[in-house]
């Protein structure tokens, strides 16, 4: 489902690092999370088919910088009975299945939430830095795509700036 969006955004990546002072805090309209983007992200709403024939609403916030694509995907599974651990593992497996190489994979913890951290490189030489969490019936995927030849600093800054809002 989200793999096609990620693959489409891999095309045409390559230029220098982003200016440190251009990053600003973005708060999603629902107030669920914050993340830093080096500009204003575009919002995209779509429906993805679920295994039972219904659809899962997905909201994405993304920014193509010319050197990379930075995005947060929010898939709303709140109408379904979903095993949070399995949802995170399935998303991680889907990301690894698109990769030619897995550079890093680990359990991660953020704001009291458990998740997965991945860095994979696809057959075209694009690196995907990914953080995956399942919180409150939503699957969150924080993704930075950039050519593997570029330094990892901007990708790390983006995924590490993501936080769940305190409620």
Language model: regions and residue ranges:
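Sec/Tat signal peptide C-region and signal peptidase I cleavage site
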Residues: 15-19
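A mature extracytoplasmic/lumenal domain signature
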Residues: 30, 39-41, 76-77, 122, ...
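Short N-terminal segments immediately surrounding and downstream of signal-peptide cleavage
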Residues: 21-37
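A short acidic-to-branched-hydrophobic micro-motif
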Residues: 58-86, 140-142
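Glycine-centered tight beta-turn/hairpin loop motif at sheet-sheet or coil-to-beta transitions
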Residues: 30-32, 65-68, 123-125, 137
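Sec-dependent N-terminal signal peptides
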Residues: 3-13
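Surface-exposed amphipathic alpha-helical segments
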Residues: 29, 41-43, 87-99, 138, ...
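Signature of long, low-cysteine stretches enriched in small and polar/charged residues
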Residues: 36-60, 90-135
């Amino acid at each position: 489902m989200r793999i096609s969006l990620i693959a489409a955004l891999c095309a045409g990546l390559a230029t220098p690092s982003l200016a440190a002072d251009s990053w600003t805090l973005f708060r999603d309209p629902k107030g669920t999370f914050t993340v830093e983007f080096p500009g204003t992200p575009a919002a995209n709403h779509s429906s993805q088919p679920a295994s039972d024939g219904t659809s899962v609403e997905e909201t994405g916030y993304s920014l193509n910088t010319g050197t990379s694509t930075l995005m947060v995907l929010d898939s709303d599974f709140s109408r379904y009975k979903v095993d949070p651990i399995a949802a995170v593992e399935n998303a991680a497996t889907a990301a690894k299945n698109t990769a030619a190489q897995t550079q890093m994979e680990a359990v991660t913890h953020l704001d009291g939430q458990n998740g997965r951290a991945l860095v994979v490189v696809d057959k075209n030489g694009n690196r995907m830095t990914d953080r995956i969490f399942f919180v409150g019936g939503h699957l969150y995927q924080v993704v930075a795509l950039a050519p593997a030849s570029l330094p990892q600093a901007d990708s790390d800054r983006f995924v590490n700036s993501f936080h769940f809002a305190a409620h």
